[in-house]
Regions:
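Periplasmic-side early beta-strands and strand-to-turn transitions of outer-membrane beta-barrels
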Residues: 141-142, 154-156, 160-164, 168-172, ...
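Conserved C-terminal beta-signal and adjacent last beta-strands/turns
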Residues: 5-7, 186, 230, 511-607
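Extracytoplasmic beta-strand/coil segments of soluble accessory domains associated
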Residues: 36, 68, 72-109
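Outer-membrane beta-barrel signature, preferentially recognizing the C-terminal barrel domain
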Residues: 256-275, 279, 307-310, 342, ...
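Short acidic/polar hinge/loop motifs at secondary-structure boundaries
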Residues: 109-137
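Gram-negative outer-membrane beta-barrel transporters
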Residues: 356-360, 447, 470-545, 573, ...
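N-terminal periplasmic accessory domains that precede
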Residues: 67-70, 89-92, 101-104, 120-125, ...
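N-terminal Sec signal peptide and the immediately downstream disordered periplasmic leader
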Residues: 1-74, 186-187, 233, 486
Length: 607
């Protein structure tokens, strides 16, 4: 069922008055760095791993409200959702979903320890108050430990970009009775960075179930804080914090719940991370303490089910810079995770050798050992190469293995099996990038396999749950990513991304993973004060999950999105955004609705 809503009354919205191409990809230049590919910050051209970088300006001007939907403009990234904003949404990297993709916000691991798969739910996360995003692809357990089998998504909150005190305020309103307000404040001195953001989002939504009639609304408040102070020339300290309080209505499979349609999740999540950095000659050190807690209550037809998860972590990271052709990174960490029934702990140690034998060649070798309280030790490794064959041509290659330990829920005999062993993975990619004047072209081949994969089988009767059990099997994904950016002229920029993914689970097509995924974006600077972005997404050949009803709309679809910005003054920008311009009727998860045409307008004021 398709839901169409017209643009509501004008308010205020986020959008800088410069052209932001809809398919977001950092323009290639020597100053661009990745902070997650290696343990130390690395120039993007010197990284052998495949990384997508989305600048803060493009995140803040995202043409989609849900951040997970916006990320699908990147090659290799897809998503599915069980309804409107606030309902469960999974982001996949090269066919692997949330359970295999740790999500970090300001260094805090925000994956839910109490969720059945252990992943992060993108359902209620918008771009409000967020900044730069990095997506690291392939098995990365040698860098990030367990679960980093498909890759890692690293999100930064608001950051100061200039000295002094600055801020912005924005509100946005539109279809589906959507309302959002955002406040951001930043301060920078010679030694201190400080940023705070707060957002409030409310929407009436639409029926999550394709067979339902009542709207499923969503409301959330989110706050982020970042602080760093350079105490002396060799010592720095800081902290980051986040708080999320949300209420999201949802539908079970098959339709609305029993009257009064009271199916909803109430979630409160808090995160805190403190760190100290010390430089002692050629060796740098960082010690960090972090805590994340998710307290969720799922109410379905009058029955409340609590889910509470906590994660506590201590990190030490060190780096020895010889000043020559090689440097050595090393570290250790201790993590505790618990839900209402169980508790585990993990001790990890790692080392990473970076070698630059010539000015055009960079090699990275990483090894990590994780000692899990429920299993034997797991050793992970990674090797990566970046070769600048010519000044305008870069060849990248990487091979890595990884592991994912069963979650607390999967070890629970009611749903799973306490004898489950960790999943193991192998992945590699090979890519080439051609620099252009004001753009680039990139092609990457990739492959990932997982042995002993744990998945949920709704037809299994092995456990006492009565509605399915976790089982084990195998997974393979192979494919090709193509992407590029071309500056047509001084006023027009074209972005494109195409991904072919052939993913199999236990010898059958993996569900909800498109075989073909295309995104095209055109950014236009129409006048000095007016810019617009036009985006087209086409998805083809998708297999619905076994839970989808016989009548579903999972398959091929094409979406058009438009957003435009008008700079009223140097400090005030008016904004218009239209999602699904031609009102496509489609589903990304069988039996669950997606939005029809939806329009939003607003204004953003900087000070």
């Amino acid at each position: 069922m398709k839901h169409v809503a017209t643009c509501a009354l004008c308010a205020l919205a986020t959008a800088p008055a410069v052209a932001q191409p809809a398919v977001a990809q950092e323009a290639f230049d020597l100053d661009t760095i990745t902070v997650i590919a290696n343990q130390t910050a690395t120039a993007l051209e010197r990284s052998g791993s495949t990384v997508e970088i989305i600048p803060a300006t493009e995140v803040q001007a995202a043409p989609r409200a849900r951040l997970g939907d916006f990320l699908t403009f990147q090659p290799g990234i897809t998503s599915s959702a069980n309804g409107p904003l606030g309902t469960t949404s999974t982001v996949r990297i090269r066919g692997l979903g949330g359970a295999y993709v740790p999500v970090l916000i300001d260094g805090i691991d925000v994956t839910d320890p109490a969720s059945s798969g252990g992943g992060f739910d993108f359902g209620g996360l918008t771009n409000a108050g967020l900044g730069r995003i990095e997506i690291l692809k392939g098995s990365q357990s040698a860098r990030f430990g367990q679960n980093a089998v498909g890759g890692v998504i690293n999100i930064e909150s608001l950051r100061p970009t200039e000295d002094g005190m600055h801020g912005f305020a924005e509100v946005e309103a539109g279809s589906l009775d959507f309302r959002r307000g955002v406040l951001g404040l930043t301060a920078r001195t010679a030694r201190t960075d400080l940023a705070f953001s707060f957002s409030r989002t409310e929407t009436d939504g639409f029926s999550a179930s394709a067979f339902g009639t009542e709207d499923d609304g969503f409301e959330a408040s989110q706050a982020n804080l970042y602080f760093r102070h350079q105490v002396s020339d060799i010592l720095a300290a800081g902290l980051s914090a986040l708080y999320i309080d949300s209420r999201a209505e949802f539908d079970e499979f098959g339709g609305d719940g029993a009257p009064p349609f009271d199916e909803f999740n109430k979630t409160e999540a808090t995160g805190l991370r403190g760190f100290v950095e010390l430089q002692t000659g050629a060796v740098s050190h960082e010690v960090a303490l972090s805590h994340f807690e998710s307290d969720r209550v799922s109410n379905s037809n009058g029955v409340a089910s609590p889910f509470k998860g906590e994660r506590r972590r201590v990190d030490y990271r060190g780096s020895y810079d010889t000043g020559g052709i090689w440097s050595l990174n090393f570290g250790a960490d201790y993590t505790e995770e618990e839900d209402l029934n169980q508790k585990i702990d993990i001790v990890g140690v790692q080392t990473e050798l970076l070698i630059a034998p010539t000015d055009t060649l960079d090699l990275a070798f990483s090894v990590r050992n994780d000692d899990h309280s429920e299993f034997s030790s797991e050793l992970s490794s990674r090797a990566a190469l970046s070769w600048r064959a010519r000044p305008d041509l870069i060849v990248r290659a990487s091979v890595s293995d990884g592991f994912r330990a069963p979650t607390l829920t999967q070890l629970d005999p009611f749903f799973g099996d306490p004898d489950f062993q960790p999943e193991t993975s192998l992945s590699y990619d090979l890519g080439v990038e051609k620099r252009l004047d004001g753009g680039f072209l990139r092609a990457t081949l990739f492959y990932t396999e997982i042995d002993n994969q744990i998945f949920f089988d709704g037809n299994s009767t092995r456990c006492p749950s009565g509605f399915g059990c976790f089982e084990k099997g195998d997974f393979e994904a192979r494919g090709l990513e193509l992407s590029g950016r071309v500056a047509i002229n001084a006023f027009l920029t074209l972005d494109a991304a195409y991904t072919y993914t052939d993913a199999d689970q236990n010898g059958e097509r993996a569900a909800r993973v498109p075989r073909h995924d295309v995104a095209l974006g055109l950014g236009a600077q129409i006048t000095p004060r007016i810019d617009a972005q036009f985006t087209v997404q086409h998805v083809a050949d998708v297999e619905p999950s076994s839970f989808a009803p016989p009548v579903n709309k999972v398959g091929d679809y094409t979406l058009f999105h438009v957003n435009a910005n008008y700079a009223l003054t140097d400090a005030v920008t008016a904004y218009l955004r239209v999602e699904n311009l031609f009102d496509e009727d489609y589903e990304t998860a069988g039996g669950f609705n997606t939005s029809g045409r939806a329009g939003f307008v607003g204004l953003r004021a900087s000070f």
